Every structure is written in structure tokens, then in C-alpha cells.
Swiss-Prot record:
GO terms for molecular function: ribosome binding; RNA binding; translation initiation factor activity. Belongs to the eIF-3 subunit K family. Coiled coil: none annotated. Pfam families: CSN8_PSD8_EIF3K. Residues 45-227 form the PCI domain. GO terms for cellular component: eukaryotic 43S preinitiation complex; eukaryotic 48S preinitiation complex; eukaryotic translation initiation factor 3 complex. GO terms for biological process: formation of cytoplasmic translation initiation complex; regulation of translational initiation. Component of the eukaryotic translation initiation factor 3 (eIF-3) complex. This is Eukaryotic translation initiation factor 3 subunit K. It is found in: Cytoplasm.
Length: 257
């Protein structure tokens, strides 16, 4: 597993900022914001750099750029399950939090319209994160497709839906050896057996079994065995030295104080 603060695709000038005092220089905000745009375009993700930018926003609230923040959150969705989204959310102003206290709710009620829109955007993305992290994949897609605002919030992230489907497939591959194609179709928000088959075969390397199928019913998707989905018994043992056992017996004969 790669170190949290490392990213293979990170440009040298970003790495230099993160490892120097300029990391806390407000003048680097524009550089980090451009880097977020780059991540959205080339499908990379640098959590450490994004958190550094959010920390700059936290220290310098007037510099906060709402579009950049929502892009960071949208990108964090594409690497679930990971702490990236919750870590990003924790650095945002208290009034954006989805589980606000009575004091922050009172503050939110008096926010200007532009800021209120930002709060709504953050909370909608948080709802999507909750659905993904709790494996409610069908509900995630229905929610994503239920409001044009979701499309606007993820529009800057190239291949957003494809990246989410790949992450869902990775999680399915950890938990299943076989799964009904109709169920998987709902989890991946795909229409038609041909589209699903192309994805699971070409992208995932899985097999589609139609031997017992009647039309699209009864089609099974088979996932190759891996260390995560292989059912195996686990026997654990612990060696206890005789001197340890002797102390336990001796303590039983000791007189209480």
C-alpha cells in the first residue's frame, strides 16, 4: 500500500510545495486549484495535495473557492471506500456539515444565497458518499439521476460514472464468487445484457454464464477466485508458556489482602 502522502502522478512543483514552507503560503492557493482541475481532467487523484488546499481555505476563509471544493469532494467519491471524502469534509466550514448542531443551523439560515447553494452542494455530495460507503449502489444511481444538480456537481470530473462503476466492481469482486446479472446491472446502472457483458468481460475480466438463462433471466456473472472472496477456514492458536500458566494458578491460592 502506498504511503498516504505519496502520489505517483504528482508533478514536481506540487511535491516541492507540499514538502516546504510554501505549503502554508496563501499565494500557492491558485497553484493547488489548477492542480485540482488537472486531476479532474486526467482522472488522477492526489488526496494529500487536495487536503493541503482545503487546509489553506480553513486558515484563509476569503480564499475559499466553492467550485474547487465540490470538485475535490466529487473526485473523492471516485476512490471509495477510503477516508478521502470524510477527511476533506472535516476541513470545511462547520455550516456545511450535514449533521449540523442547532447553532450551525441558525448560522446556515442567515447565509447569503451563493453560500447556501454551496452548502446544498456539499450536503448532496455527502449523501452520495454515504450511499457508496454503505454499499447502497442502486440507491446511489437513482439518487444521482434524480436531480440535475448532481450532474452539475460531477460534470467537471472526467469519466465520473465510469470511475464509480469500476470501484463498485472492485468491491463486488472482493465479496462475491458469482452474482446474478440482473442484480449487478442495477448496482452498475447499466441497461441491457450486452452492455453489462462487455464491461464485466473486457474491464473486469470476469465470466458471464448463460447456460441456465431464459432471456436475460438466470444469467450469472462469475468472479475468479481471489484472496478476498475465497471462502476458507481460519484456525488461530496461541502458545501459553508454563510459567504464565503457573502465575495464574499461584494467584488463585493467594490470600486476599
Amino acid at each position: 500500500m502506498a504511503a498516504f502522502d505519496k502520489c505517483k502522478t504528482r508533478p514536481a512543483h506540487i511535491d516541492a510545495i507540499l514538502n516546504g514552507l510554501d505549503r502554508y503560503n496563501p499565494e500557492t492557493t491558485a497553484v493547488f486549484q489548477d492542480y485540482v482541475v488537472q486531476q479532474c481532467e486526467d482522472r488522477t487523484f492526489d488526496c494529500y495535495a487536495n487536503l493541503a488546499l482545503l487546509k489553506l481555505y480553513q486558515f484563509n476563509p476569503p480564499l475559499l473557492n466553492a467550485e474547487t471544493v465540490t470538485n475535490i469532494l466529487a473526485k473523492a467519491l471516485t476512490v471509495f471506500p477510503s477516508p478521502a471524502f470524510s477527511l476533506s469534509l472535516a476541513l470545511l466550514p462547520a455550516y456545511t456539515q450535514p449533521y449540523a448542531t442547532s447553532s450551525t443551523q441558525a448560522t446556515t439560515a442567515n447565509l447569503p444565497m451563493q453560500t447556501a447553494d454551496f452548502v446544498e452542494a456539499v450536503q448532496k455530495l455527502t449523501h452520495l458518499s454515504t450511499l457508496l460507503e454503505s454499499a447502497q449502489y442502486t440507491a446511489f444511481w437513482s439518487t444521482l439521476n434524480s436531480d440535475d444538480l448532481y450532474a452539475d456537481l460531477t460534470a467537471d470530473v472526467a469519466g465520473f460514472e465510469e470511475l464509480i462503476r469500476i470501484r463498485i466492481a472492485v468491491e463486488v469482486g472482493k465479496a462475491f464468487r458469482e452474482i446474478g446479472a440482473d442484480v449487478l446491472m442495477g448496482w452498475l446502472d447499466m441497461r441491457g445484457m450486452e452492455t453489462l457483458e462487455k464491461f464485466v468481460v473486457d474491464v473486469c475480466g470476469w465470466e458471464v454464464d448463460k447456460s441456465k438463462a431464459e432471456g436475460e433471466n438466470g444469467v450469472i456473472v462469475r468472479v475468479p477466485r481471489n484472496k478476498e472472496n475465497e471462502a476458507r477456514g481460519e484456525v488461530k492458536g496461541e502458545k501459553v508458556g508454563i510459567e504464565m500458566f503457573g502465575r495464574v494458578v499461584r494467584r488463585g491460592f493467594e490470600q486476599p489482602a
